[in-house]
């Protein structure tokens, strides 16, 4: 039952001090002096006149102002039913009434009737267990009584008032005020008549009267920077063609599969001229590079995916593609966690990219950043006038070194926001895995901090973040069998890839940062001195099976003055390429999955520059073209030899032949699950050819040379073993037989035993 407004109540309402606009606006039934009558109120800022228009007859009834140019009311006689109607208004800037506006009254659709967010939804969200909260909060296209519109919902528990603003209401927060849904902290409103493409924000009025304009934390699309508005988007219009891929993924154990990842920053892989606009979508210019634009998701699908497939990589890993305001952050300072960046196109365009990758047999991994977020005013920071998403105490809630804020993992709704976000990318965009950035920064309360707050037991372990990771990974694998959850964890935190039920964090892969640093230190040395540091090559095998490791040379290793991979290698031009080939050879035969950052496959000299594309012109030169061919050959070898991947995480998959040769040579055997699947690997990390080098082997017969990094086809010197070697009946290295090999300088050799074939009788 409605009520008549006093002058004081009118003033409060037009200044956005009510939390239930449905109690005031729209159709109301009034009881007064024993009589019942209906009325309709409308809040229309900057209106000269407002009319209620009866839909059936077109009759327009002028509404009376309760507040000048803002709040209007029309009363009906007792017993007169309220008609089906819409509103019409003449604005103050249209004195002649030449551009009258018409719209459906949002407040004639009670939220109880809309029923988009139920009590169970609110309960699960406040508990931190609504795994599909993205289907409820944010902007969603719905139809009520045959009227199409958008249901908006946002969590802002400490706000005095929240409104939706956009072009559809001239960015005036008085017109579309939201209703607070009980004690959940959620505000909601259904706005009829708007649809996909509508730009909007939330106007949040704090408890002390300040007003913030915020992008939608659950918005599916945002404007291209520097604009900051959210965009209504329908994620259900794309028709997928990857069902066979998803079914195969669900039936596949990734730890027993070949995984070789090509890490890509979409904005700097390849550019196009601004004078050559894309066939579809808008042209977004690259900052600091005149007359240059980004490729769109659809253009990248046509160029990047065939390139990756040709090179033989199994997956593409994308540096963050969630919306971020600053290109120079590489995507790691996210504002729109549910919005794929508009720099390269629409959500449907990104779906097309992933779909095309799956059809080509390539998985898609995205970098995900739950560890921190930027302080930009339109983002999550101080969202409702309080520290809503972040910890309030800066000793826990701020990364001084990065200038960012830390999520409050102990708050149910914040944890729900993040966990559901990871699930969202799998469900809506069909991604195959996430790589969680900066895990160590989340696990330690004293990470990069001079002042910090210990946990309740006095330790530095971040117990709330630990619980967050366990919940995250449990749900990822529950809903997405065969998926990847990869941790970038740079310390020796135990059990990162162990199951949660035995006390682990639940990831299924972890970057091996120790191996990466050891190998770069080793290969940076003059080759003559490597013999004095064999531990840098062998130490990783002391712990290689304590976790499920991925060996990665990532974007972080080719920036900030570290030089690119070739620049890290000593010696002249030829020796740099030879050392890099030997390193890649060791990487692809060492236990663990593989990741290479873009441009490493052809040996770029310049460091990675986010404002420029790769130095593709280098491929016209033989050394670079042949290095790329070598990487493709390594990928082919990896995928064709089960010994190199089926037991990556098991000690049974590896055996040293000799790890103590002071000449900078190591040799070992990789075993597959099938006892007949095994290969021999010999690495010579010094610039000396060893023509009569003997190693022990377990079987008699012929050993075919599968790979020689010094082959002429890879721009090597051509020294080798003429395709293979026969064994000698000479025990060596505690093995019953041996091979006498010619070891090229700075090389990796891979050999495979050929079982003896029975000789057919001539009779």
From Swiss-Prot:
<dbReference type="InterPro" id="IPR017853">
    <property type="entry name" value="Glycoside_hydrolase_SF"/>
</dbReference>
<dbReference type="InterPro" id="IPR037439">
    <property type="entry name" value="Branching_enzy"/>
</dbReference>
<dbReference type="Pfam" id="PF02922">
    <property type="entry name" value="CBM_48"/>
</dbReference>
<dbReference type="GO" id="GO:0005978">
    <property type="term" value="P:glycogen biosynthetic process"/>
</dbReference>
<keyword id="KW-0119">Carbohydrate metabolism</keyword>
<dbReference type="InterPro" id="IPR013780">
    <property type="entry name" value="Glyco_hydro_b"/>
</dbReference>
<dbReference type="InterPro" id="IPR014756">
    <property type="entry name" value="Ig_E-set"/>
</dbReference>
<comment type="function">
    <text>Catalyzes the formation of the alpha-1,6-glucosidic linkages in glycogen by scission of a 1,4-alpha-linked oligosaccharide from growing alpha-1,4-glucan chains and the subsequent attachment of the oligosaccharide to the alpha-1,6 position.</text>
</comment>
<protein>
    <recommendedName>
        <fullName>1,4-alpha-glucan branching enzyme GlgB</fullName>
        <ecNumber>2.4.1.18</ecNumber>
    </recommendedName>
</protein>
<dbReference type="Pfam" id="PF02806">
    <property type="entry name" value="Alpha-amylase_C"/>
</dbReference>
<feature type="active site" description="Proton donor">
    <location>
        <position position="488"/>
    </location>
</feature>
<dbReference type="InterPro" id="IPR054169">
    <property type="entry name" value="GlgB_N"/>
</dbReference>
<dbReference type="InterPro" id="IPR006407">
    <property type="entry name" value="GlgB"/>
</dbReference>
<dbReference type="InterPro" id="IPR044143">
    <property type="entry name" value="GlgB_N_E_set_prok"/>
</dbReference>
<dbReference type="InterPro" id="IPR006047">
    <property type="entry name" value="Glyco_hydro_13_cat_dom"/>
</dbReference>
<keyword id="KW-0328">Glycosyltransferase</keyword>
<feature type="active site" description="Nucleophile">
    <location>
        <position position="437"/>
    </location>
</feature>
<keyword id="KW-0321">Glycogen metabolism</keyword>
<dbReference type="InterPro" id="IPR006048">
    <property type="entry name" value="A-amylase/branching_C"/>
</dbReference>
<dbReference type="Pfam" id="PF00128">
    <property type="entry name" value="Alpha-amylase"/>
</dbReference>
<dbReference type="Pfam" id="PF22019">
    <property type="entry name" value="GlgB_N"/>
</dbReference>
<comment type="subunit">
    <text>Monomer.</text>
</comment>
<dbReference type="InterPro" id="IPR013783">
    <property type="entry name" value="Ig-like_fold"/>
</dbReference>
<keyword id="KW-0320">Glycogen biosynthesis</keyword>
<dbReference type="GO" id="GO:0004553">
    <property type="term" value="F:hydrolase activity, hydrolyzing O-glycosyl compounds"/>
</dbReference>
<comment type="pathway">
    <text>Glycan biosynthesis; glycogen biosynthesis.</text>
</comment>
<comment type="similarity">
    <text>Belongs to the glycosyl hydrolase 13 family. GlgB subfamily.</text>
</comment>
<dbReference type="GO" id="GO:0003844">
    <property type="term" value="F:1,4-alpha-glucan branching enzyme activity"/>
</dbReference>
<dbReference type="GO" id="GO:0005829">
    <property type="term" value="C:cytosol"/>
</dbReference>
<dbReference type="GO" id="GO:0043169">
    <property type="term" value="F:cation binding"/>
</dbReference>
<dbReference type="InterPro" id="IPR004193">
    <property type="entry name" value="Glyco_hydro_13_N"/>
</dbReference>
<keyword id="KW-0808">Transferase</keyword>
């Amino acid at each position: 039952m409605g009520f008549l407004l006093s002058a004081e109540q009118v003033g409060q309402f037009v200044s956005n001090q009510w939390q239930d606009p449905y109690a005031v606006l729209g159709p109301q039934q009034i009881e007064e002096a024993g009589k019942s009558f209906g009325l309709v109120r409308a809040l229309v800022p900057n209106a000269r006149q407002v009319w209620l228009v009866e839909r059936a007859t077109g009759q327009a009834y002028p509404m009376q102002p309760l507040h000048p140019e803002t709040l209007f009311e029309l009363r009906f006689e007792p017993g007169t039913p309220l008609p089906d109607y819409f509103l019409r208004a003449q604005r103050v800037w249209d004195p002649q009434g030449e551009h009258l506006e018409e719209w459906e009254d949002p407040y004639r659709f009670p939220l109880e009737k809309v029923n988009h967010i139920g009590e169970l939804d609110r309960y699960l969200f406040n508990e931190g267990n609504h795994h599909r909260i993205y289907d409820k909060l944010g902007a969603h296209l719905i139809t009520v009584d045959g009227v199409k519109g958008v249901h908006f919902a946002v969590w802002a528990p400490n706000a005095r008032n929240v409104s939706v603003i956009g072009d559809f209401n001239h960015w005036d927060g008085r017109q579309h005020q939201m209703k607070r849904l009980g004690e959940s902290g959620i505000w909601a409103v259904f706005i009829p008549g708007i649809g996909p493409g509508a730009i909007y924000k939330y106007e949040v009025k704090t408890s002390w009267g300040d007003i913030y304009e915020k992008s939608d934390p659950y918005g599916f699309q945002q404007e291209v920077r520097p604009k900051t508005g959210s965009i209504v988007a329908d994620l259900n219009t794309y028709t997928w063609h990857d069902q066979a891929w998803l079914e195969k993924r669900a039936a596949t154990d990734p730890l027993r599969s070949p995984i070789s990842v090509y890490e890509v920053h979409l904005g700097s892989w390849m550019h196009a001229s601004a004078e050559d606009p894309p066939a579809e979508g808008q042209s977004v210019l690259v900052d600091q590079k005149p007359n240059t634009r980004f490729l769109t998701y659809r253009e990248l699908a046509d160029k990047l995916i065939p390139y990756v497939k040709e090179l033989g990589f199994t997956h593409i890993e994308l540096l963050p593609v969630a919306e971020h305001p600053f290109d120079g952050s590489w995507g790691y300072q996210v504002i729109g966690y549910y919005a794929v960046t508009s720099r390269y196109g629409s959500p449907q365009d990104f779906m097309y990219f992933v779909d095309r990758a799956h059809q080509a047999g390539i998985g898609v991994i995205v970098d995900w950043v739950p560890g921190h977020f930027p302080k930009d005013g339109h983002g999550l920071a101080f969202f409702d006038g309080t520290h809503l998403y972040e910890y309030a105490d800066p000793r826990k809630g701020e990364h001084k070194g990065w200038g960012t804020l830390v999520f409050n993992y102990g708050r149910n709704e914040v944890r729900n926001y993040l966990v559901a976000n990871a699930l969202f990318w799998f469900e809506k965009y069909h991604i195959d895995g996430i790589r969680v950035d900066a895990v160590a920064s989340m696990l330690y309360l004293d990470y990069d901090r001079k002042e910090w707050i210990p946990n309740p037991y006095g330790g530095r372990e971040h117990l709330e973040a630990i619980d967050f990771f366990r919940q995250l990974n449990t749900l990822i694998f529950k809903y997405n069998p065969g998926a990847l959850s990869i941790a970038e964890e740079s310390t020796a935190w135990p059990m990162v890839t162990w199951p949660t039920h035995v006390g682990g964090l639940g990831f299924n892969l972890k970057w091996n940062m120790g191996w990466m640093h050891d190998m770069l230190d080793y290969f940076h040395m003059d080759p003559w001195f490597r013999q004095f540091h064999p531990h840098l090559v062998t130490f990783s095998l002391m712990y290689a099976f304590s976790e499920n490791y991925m060996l990665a040379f990532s974007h972080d290793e080719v920036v900030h003055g570290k030089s690119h991979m070739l620049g890290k290698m000593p010696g002249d031009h030829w020796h740099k390429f030879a050392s890099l080939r030997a390193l890649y050879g060791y990487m692809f035969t060492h236990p663990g999955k593989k990741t290479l950052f873009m441009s490493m496959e052809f040996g770029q000299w310049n460091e990675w520059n986010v404002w420029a594309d790769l130095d593709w012109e280098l491929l016209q030169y033989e050394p670079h073209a042949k290095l790329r061919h070598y990487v493709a050959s390594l990928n082919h070898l990896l995928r064709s030899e089960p010994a190199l991947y089926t037991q990556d995480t098991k000690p049974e998959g590896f055996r040293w032949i000799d790890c103590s040769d002071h000449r900078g040579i190591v040799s070992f055997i990789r075993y597959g699950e099938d006892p007949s699947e095994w290969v021999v690997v010999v690495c010579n990390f010094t610039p000396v050819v060893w023509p009569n080098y003997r190693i022990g082997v377990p079987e008699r017969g012929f050993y075919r040379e599968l790979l020689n990094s010094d082959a002429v086809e890879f721009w090597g010197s051509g020294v080798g073993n003429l395709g293979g070697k026969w064994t000698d009946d000479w025990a060596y290295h505690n093995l019953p037989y041996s091979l006498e090999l010619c070891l090229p300088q700075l090389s990796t050799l891979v050999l495979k035993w050929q079982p003896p074939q029975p000789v057919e009788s001539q009779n």
